Amino acid sequence: AWKCLPKDSTCGDDCDCCEGLHCHCPLRNMLPAILRCSCQSKDDHINTCPKYKKS
């Protein structure tokens, strides 16, 4: 079965991360060549993946 990625795991988008986490890319605007995104749990961000939307 598919499992979500825990905090600090490298990710491609919010859907890779577990609910409550979001895929954070701190270097997105500075160094695209070494882009490294990771699942984080910052309070001011939410996971926007459709699979976690509450019905």
Swiss-Prot record:
It comes from the Eukaryota. Its main location: secreted. GO terms for molecular function: calcium channel regulator activity; toxin activity. The keyword Aminoacyl-tRNA synthetase does not apply. Disulfide bonds join C4-C18, C11-C23, C15-C49, C17-C39, C25-C37. The presence of a 'disulfide through disulfide knot' structurally defines this protein as a knottin. Weak blocker of vertebrate P/Q-, N- and L-type voltage-gated calcium channels (Cav1 and Cav2). Is both paralytic and lethal when injected into lepidopteran larvae. Is not toxic to mice. Belongs to the spiderine family. Spiderine subfamily. Residues 1-53 form the Oxytoxin-type inhibitor cystine knot (ICK) domain. Expressed by the venom gland. The modification Serine amide is found at S55. Keywords: Amidation, Calcium channel impairing toxin, Disulfide bond, Ion channel impairing toxin, Knottin, Neurotoxin, Secreted, Toxin, Voltage-gated calcium channel impairing toxin. GO terms for cellular component: extracellular region. This is Omega-oxotoxin-Ol1b. It comes from Oxyopes lineatus (Lynx spider). It is found in: Secreted.
